[in-house]
Swiss-Prot record:
Pathway: Protein modification; lipoprotein biosynthesis (signal peptide cleavage). This is Lipoprotein signal peptidase. InterPro entries: Peptidase_A8. The active site is at 116, 132. The gene is lspA.
Amino acid sequence: MRFKNRLFWIAAFIAFFVDQLTKYWVVQTFSLGETLPILPGIFHFTYVTNTGAAFSLFSGKVEWLRWLSLGVSLLLIGLALLGPVLERWDQLGYGLILGGAMGNGIDRFALGYVVDFLDFRLINFAVFNMADSFISIGIVCLLLASLQKSPDSHHRSR
């Protein structure tokens, strides 16, 4: 049996591994609330915890967010295992979303919160983590995939 949707699994593994590794580094290196200016006033590493979703949305809703993360993860795994062979951009997008959902989901189940540390101060944006980034990049990949697919109506002769 050939391994189906290989790019999906590679993207999911890399996203999950990078997310967990960077969070581990932050927790081991910084005290809660500590910040390290990388580009002062523009970009910092700031260790905070988040009981909400990506970019601090739905703060304090960790209970249903942990189940949402699990549900999304199981749905994507089912799609990759039981569904058709996906196009490359779809595999990449869904894989990155799975890796990010699993990374934040594990934090929510194990800790009750998510570790965030990427702090773009220039635009006064919420502190976030690599899982949030991978989910966002995955969504962009899916948008690109949908733009590349031409509707059947374009192929009809007029």
